[in-house]
Structure formats: C-alpha cells, structure tokens
From Swiss-Prot:
GO terms for molecular function: ATP binding; ATP hydrolysis activity. Belongs to the TrbE/VirB4 family. This is Probable conjugal transfer protein TrbE part 2. CDD domains: ABC_ATPase, TrwB_TraG_TraD_VirD4. InterPro entries: AAA+_ATPase, CagE_TrbE_VirB_cntrl_dom, P-loop_NTPase, T4SS_component. ATP binds at residues 307-314. It comes from the Bacteria. NCBIfam families: PRK13830.1. Gene3D superfamilies: P-loop containing nucleotide triphosphate hydrolases (3.40.50.300).
Length: 662
C-alpha cells in the first residue's frame, strides 16, 4: 500500500512539473547542542497547523510518534464570527461565478496588503456521474423552453423562452465535453480564511476582499451562519462540510485557482563577486508579499530606467545610490542633472562637484589637470588620444604628423614637472595644434576647467558630478571633461562593488563619443564588478541612439516609471521593441506616478511601491530649488551636522536622536 501511495505521489509530481514549480513537504533535521542531539521539523505538520490555527511557525516532532497531538492545540468557538483561541476567524466565500473566465482572473488578490489563506476545494466526478448531473440540468432548462400549458395540451403558442434555449445548448456542449473527456467536472468550493485578534479589523479585511472579488465580476459573501462549516470545509481532507459547491469543469478550475505566486526577489545579492550572503539592494512594499529588489541578474547589474519627466526617476536613483552603500567597500559614481543627488551625497559624507557652475559655498572652483598622470604606457596612450580628440573638436583634420607631434610631447612631459595643458601647448611644435588647444588653456574659455597645474578632483567612495551647467556649454566643452571623468572612474574600478549612475542619459546617447563609451561599459565593466544604471526620460532618443539593441541585451534589469502615454502609438512600439507585452504596457500606463515602479528581469517582474517615509524623502526626494538652496546654506553653516538642522526644519524636532547627536 505504501509503495502504491509513493508511486501515485511521484506521478502527480511529474504531471505538475510540466507547468508548475512544486516541492514536496519534507521532514528536515537540525543539529542541536553541538551535534549531540538531532531535532526533527516537519513542513507538512507546520502547514496543517497553519490551516487550523492561522499560526505559521516550525513544529518540532516529538520523540514519541504521536504527531496528531501537535496539530490542534487551540480551542474553536462557534458563532457568527468563530474564534480560534484568542483570534477571530473570518470567511469570505466566492460564489456567483461570471459567465466566462481566463487564466489568473483573481490574481488581483495578490495585491492585498494582508495575510489570508485561499482554499480551493474541488471534488471530482467521474465521466458518467458528471453526464448524469448535466443531463438533469439540461432537462430542467428544456422544460422551461415552452410554456407549461403548451406542453400540457400539446399546443403551439409560439412563445419560447430564448434564455432557456441558450442554457440548453450550453448544457449540451458541456455534456459533449464530458463525454469526450477533454475536461472533467466536479464541485468547486472556494473560500478565503482570515484571522485577526480584533473583530473590527477582521471585518474591514473581509470587506476589502469582498469588494475586490466583486470588482472582478464574481459574487462574494462574508459567511455568518455558515462560517464554521465553511472554515471546516477549507481544511485539508475535509470534503463534506460546506454545502456551497457549484458544478464547474477543470478548464474553469485552472482559471480560478491561484497557480502563480508573487515574485518576491532574491533575499541575497545574486552577484557572485559580492561577499557571500550580501543582502539584497533594498526591500520594498507591494501588497502582502515583500519585494527584494536587486539590480543584478547573476553577475550583470546593468540597469535601464526610463519614463516621462515628473514620474519619480530622481527619487529612485537617489534611493538606489543610498542603498548601494550597504555593501562593503562599495563605490558610487553618479552623473546628476538638477542636483537631485545633492542632499544624499552631502548627508552621506560624499563629494558633490558642480562642474562648470558657480561655487555656491565660496570655495575655489573645481579645475582639472588631465595630463597629471603619465606614469604608465597606458596613461600616456590615453593622454595622447585625449589631446587628439580636443584638436579634432576644434575642426582640425588629424594627420600622422599631428599624432606624432602630440605623442612626442606627451612622452616628454612624463619626465617633466609641469603637466598642465599650457605646458603641453608651449612644448608642442606644430602651430595648428597650438591654435586648436588655445580654447582649453588659461587664455581660452575652458582654461578654468582643464588647465590646472594640480588636479582638484579627489575621488572617494561616493562621488556625484552635477553636469547641468556643463551640458549647456556645447559639445566642444562637454566631451573633453566627461571623457576625462570617465577615465578617472575607470582607473578606480578595482573589483569592489561599484555602480555608475547616469541621470538624463539621453544627453549622452545623443553623442557618438558617449554612445561608444556606454556600449563599451555595458560590455566590459561587468568584469570589474561595476553596474551601470542608465536613466532617461526621452524614449525617442534612446530608440534613435543606434544602440537600443545593446541596451536591451546588456541591461537585463529594466525599471519602468509610470507613463500614461505608454499605450499610445509611437510609445507603445518602443515598449514592444524592448520586449514588453500588452499586459505589461497596461501596468505601466495605469501605475501611480512618483509612487509605483515596474521592474522587469529575466527572473520575474513586479510592480512595487518604495513606501518611503518622511525622513528618507528628506534626503532622496528633496530636489526643489528652494530645498536645495536651504541645504547648501545649512551645509555651509553647520558642515557635517547639517542633516540634524535640515530635519528639524522639516518638523522632526527629535532629529538629533537619529544621529546620536547631543
């Protein structure tokens, strides 16, 4: 008998394995007292106890095999609202099935922010019994087709109940399906079980579930007189309690039962280059199932974020940067536009550089010395290529003579004390090169940025570069500065967990030099344990960039911001091109701006809500110009203690306790 049972279980597993991911509940062992004793915990017993009492915790098996004594250790009190121990029991019955169904018709229940148990009892009928039940139903409707007196006196009044005729036809179709054994029929009893120690809170939960079920076209009732029977009928193995059991077929059953679970993400960072058991990037809220967000899929953490302006992109980028600091020896390099990352950077002790802008705090303006590092052959080769780019940007056609002259001068400067651009110009022999580089020396408009004797950039673990002013300076000034910054960042990538955040990436996707650099980063930075996060509000620029296929393939994680125009012609095609289906586009279109985000990875997809509190929003969501001006003033006045005063200004009078400040 045991052999037959095990074979039957194995066959069921094999049948389900084709479409479902199932795992057998087992008894596991755990060593105690340094290995002197072994404790046994049974998952099946734990699940059955959860069904009965609503308490989900490990159940340790006793040494004596009297396991049933550990299942029901709570008292059940009958009534309109039954009680198990000190917790009230609520039952929501699903009835009034709609005329048609589709897969996952009740998946919206997954979004409810509460704990419940959904029981779907189905009592199978064999083919002959199902045909008999359906035949009785057919005869009942057949009798209603013609009026009673027409049937009694065998007359034809031409009065026909067309609804009854339709039901007869549908019943005959059901009989044909049962006879062909394409589907099986049975009695279906769905109920949702809730527990709560507060009666009013339980009633509110039950009413919320009832409203959601009714919104999907079903009927639903909160059980009262039938509550105890419905609860008992929901327990595993109980087939006789609860008389509410409509007859449906297995095709409808497959649509109604919850076959899919909500993707909760990995509790640990999936990247093998991170320390073992590193936590996920963040845990956020969404319905009753927490969501653990990770940028990485295996060892690739490149992420594409896109959505319209004003939908919460800057807040998301700031939160990603803040959460990334949880990893040991992490490095964060962010290219910001609009100073949205200023509050977080200063609060975290990072460096915030406003490149090309006026220094708001009266300090010496930032200036670079790109030729300061010429120690290795690779450094000198890069310097020569960088000088060549500057000359080409001024409209000079580069010839071999130009390259030889520039390379020769870079080599000479490697052993010289002066390494500014002015030193290079004074030493190079060709007049065309001198004239082209004049624009970038102290005598030209860009000398303030690129012609320093000593580099003012000291890169630490958290660096933010505000490039809004730089972006307005034109291509000839923008390209050299960003190319140099990219070079400095690349040299710091030593295998530590790193992330490069590019806000308003459409500005860079529109330039061939940066397109090539982004393409290169997406292909090679994975080996340096660095993730690239590209955020853009211009979907059309991303599509016209020429590397949309590279973005799609190299960025396995895509985070979409709410976009009410996602279903409109033109925008829809972009979402479809990067692999989104009709349902996903609908989710993006209906999501709440500045609150909900839709993440898609090869491992799953999820609409989530970051549910940020007021303290977090004070640093990742304070991007208004008035807020930024106050923060700059507070930082200038109080230095490292400015966050306390900032929070106090926003109504947190006990802010000092958050920072352990007396």
């Amino acid at each position: 008998m045991l052999f037959i049972f095990k074979n039957a279980i194995r066959e069921i597993e094999q049948y389900f394995a084709n479409t479902l991911s199932i795992r057998r509940m087992e008894t596991r062992e755990a060593a105690e007292r340094g290995g002197e004793r072994v404790a046994r915990y049974d998952e099946l017993l734990q699940f059955i106890r959860f069904c009965i009492t609503g308490e989900n915790h490990p159940i340790r098996l006793p040494a004596a095999p009297m396991y049933l004594d550990w299942i029901a250790t709570a008292e059940l009190e009958h009534g309109l609202t039954p009680k198990v121990e000190n917790r009230f029991l609520g039952v929501v019955a699903i009835d009034g099935l709609p005329a048609e169904s589709w897969p996952g018709i009740l998946n919206s229940l997954d979004l409810m922010p509460l704990t419940y148990r959904w029981s779907s009892r189905f009592i199978f009928l064999d083919a002959e019994e199902a045909r008999q039940k359906l035949e009785r139903t057919r005869k009942k409707w057949q009798q209603k087709v013609r009026p009673f007196f027409d049937q009694l006196f065998q007359t034809q009044s031409r009065s026909v109940d067309r609804d009854a005729m339709t039901m007869v036809a549908e019943t005959e179709d059901a009989i044909a399906q049962a006879s062909s054994q394409l589907v099986a029929y049975g009695y279906y009893t769905p109920v949702i079980i809730l527990f709560d120690s507060d009666r009013e809170a339980l009633q509110e939960k039950a009413e919320a579930i009832r409203r959601l079920i009714q919104a999907e076209g079903f009927g639903a009732r909160i059980e009262t007189l039938n509550a105890t029977e419905a609860y008992l009928g929901s327990l595993p193995g109980n087939w006789y309690c609860n008389i509410r059991e409509p007859l449906i077929n297995t095709s409808n059953l497959a649509d109604l039962i919850p076959l899919n679970s909500v993707w909760s993400g990995s509790p640990v960072a999936p990247c093998p280059f991170y320390p073992p058991n590193s936590p996920s990037l963040m845990q956020v809220a969404s319905g009753s199932t927490p969501f653990r967000l990770n940028l990485h899929v295996d060892d690739v953490g490149h992420t594409l974020i896109f959505g319209p302006t004003g939908s919460g992109k800057s807040t998301l980028l700031a939160l990603i940067a803040a959460q990334f600091r949880r990893y040991d020896r992490s490095q964060i390099f962010a290219f910001d536009k609009g100073s949205a990352l200023l509050p977080l950077t200063l609060a975290a002790g990072g460096d915030h550089y406003e490149i090309g802008g006026d220094n708001a705090e009266g300090r010496k303006a930032l200036a670079f010395c790109p030729l300061s590092d010429l120690e290795s052959d690779a450094d000198r080769a890069w310097a020569a290529e960088w000088i060549e780019m500057l000359v080409a940007l001024q409209g000079v056609t580069i010839t071999p003579d130009h390259r030889n002259a520039m390379s020769r001068q870079v080599t000479l400067m490697a052993s010289a004390p002066g390494r500014s651009l002015s030193d290079f110009v004074s030493g190079v022999q060709m007049r065309e090169i001198k004239d082209a580089l004049h624009h970038y020396t102290v005598d030209g408009p860009m000398g303030q940025l690129l012609d320093a004797e000593h580099d003012g950039l000291s890169l630490g673990a958290f660096q933010t570069f505000e490039i809004e002013q730089l972006m307005n300076m034109g291509e000839r000034n923008l390209v050299p500065v960003l190319t140099y910054l990219f070079r400095r960042i690349e040299k710091l990538l030593d295998g530590s967990p790193s992330v490069i955040v590019l806000d308003e990436a459409w500005l860079m996707l529109g330039h061939p030099v940066f397109r090539a650099k982004i393409r290169e980063w997406l292909k090679v930075l994975r080996k340096a344990n660095c993730a690239v996060v590209l955020a853009t509000q211009s979907i059309s620029d991303a599509e016209r960039s020429g590397i949309i296929d590279v973005l799609k393939e190299s960025c396995p994680t895509k985070i979409c911001l709410p976009n009410g125009a996602a279903r409109e012609p033109g925008t829809r095609e972009f979402y479809e091109r990067i692999g989104f289906n009709e349902r996903q586009i609908e989710i993006i279109s209906n999501a709440t701006p500045k609150r909900e985000y839709y993440v898609v990875t090869p491992e799953g997809r999820r609409l989530f809500d970051m549910a940020l509190g007021p303290v977090a929003l004070s640093f990742v969501g304070a991007s208004g110009k008035e807020d930024l001006n106050r923060i700059r003033t507070l930082h200038s006045e109080y230095d490292r203690d400015w966050p306390v005063h900032w929070l106090q200004m926003r109504g947190f009078h006990d802010a000092a306790s958050l920072f352990n400040v007396e």
